């Protein structure tokens, strides 16, 4: 998943408190010790971010969060709530073992499309084209992946870099993002991460009882946007930065 953008409810709000309560309760129904995580909707994964240079990482995080906040705040105020909870569902996938479906509100879909276009598709496609146009800037790592060469400390001739027009790439990215938002964007709020499968009927009865014990007539304010490095164990995921949405 790499770096993901999460939309989270604000702490100490009814939405946050109720989700945390039910997530903690449901965790006890599953074997082992399912990892704990914040309630969130994943807007998109695989956001392009330079993690090698910490100073550049901070600048990129601030830039992406600032632009995301502007995009969120520019959405039409023509709905009661951007996030509307649906049914509880389950899949074989570890990260979608148990989750609330979330209605694909047009504004939520529009926001996800914008973020996907600007911070996933455009930078990835520009990088792919740059590899074609300027192969001298890249090398292979031990796993055979193409990576940028590190600047040489030795004095040498300046490497000539070929410039290229990115307008077509950006136009194509808009279409790719629109297609992704319709076919792949699947907003949901995970409640439990687990390898358990299938979920037997007795477990489902307990799940439904614990969920129905809580009044879900709640409004999700715009909340908080967070950039999260989702690599390795869930307990090791790192919040790189966040911004409140008012």
UniProtKB/Swiss-Prot annotation:
GO terms for cellular component: Golgi apparatus. The active site is at residues 40, 188. Pfam families: CPDase. Its EC number is 3.1.4.37. Gene3D superfamilies: Cyclic phosphodiesterase. GO terms for biological process: cyclic nucleotide metabolic process. Keywords: Golgi apparatus, Hydrolase. Involved in the metabolism of ADP-ribose 1',2'-cyclic phosphate which is produced as a consequence of tRNA splicing. PANTHER family: 2',3'-CYCLIC-NUCLEOTIDE 3'-PHOSPHODIESTERASE. This is 2',3'-cyclic-nucleotide 3'-phosphodiesterase. It comes from Candida albicans (strain SC5314 / ATCC MYA-2876) (Yeast). The gene is CPD1.
